[in-house]
């Protein structure tokens, strides 16, 4: 038996991937692929 609360809400996971990324402190919205193009990868070190 748990500790029942008066106003229980259904469990909604807050994990990464369940919500669309929005612009905040990081540039999630800005860095998202919006136009269907491939991201421009800048090679910084030799592979």
Curated annotation (Swiss-Prot):
GO terms for biological process: asexual sporulation; sporulation resulting in formation of a cellular spore. Residues 1-11, 29-47 have a biased composition (Polar residues). Keywords: Sporulation. The keyword Lipid biosynthesis does not apply. Induction: Expressed only in the forespore compartment of sporulating cells. It holds the Pfam family SspN. One of its GO terms (cellular component) is endospore-forming forespore. It is found in: Spore core. Residues 1-47 are annotated as: Disordered. NCBIfam families: PRK09398.1. Belongs to the SspN family. This is Small, acid-soluble spore protein N. The gene is sspN.
